[in-house]
């Protein structure tokens, strides 16, 4: 998938 990185990145940004 190519949209997973975006979702993961968003979650990581929210966590950080």
From Swiss-Prot:
Q: What does this protein do?
A: Probably forms pores in target membranes. Has antibacterial activity against Gram-positive bacteria S.aureus NBRC 13276 (MIC=25-50 uM) and B.subtilis NBRC 3009 (MIC=1.3-2.5 uM) but not against Gram-negative bacterium E.coli NBRC 3972.
Q: Which UniProt keywords apply?
A: Amidation, Antibiotic, Antimicrobial, Membrane, Secreted, Target cell membrane, Target membrane
What biological process terms from GO does the record include?
defense response to Gram-positive bacterium; killing of cells of another organism
Location in or out of the cell: Secreted; Target cell membrane
Residues modified to Lysine amide: 16
Keyword Membrane annotated: yes
According to its UniProt record, where is this protein mainly located? secreted
Please name the taxonomic classification of the source: Eukaryota, Metazoa, Ecdysozoa, Arthropoda, Chelicerata
Q: Name one GO cellular component term.
A: membrane
Describe the family membership recorded for this protein in Swiss-Prot or TrEMBL: Belongs to the non-disulfide-bridged peptide (NDBP) superfamily. Short antimicrobial peptide (group 4) family.
What tissues has this protein been observed in? Expressed by the venom gland.
The name on file for this protein is Peptide Im-6
């Amino acid at each position: 998938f190519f949209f997973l990185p975006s979702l993961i990145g968003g979650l990581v940004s929210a966590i950080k």
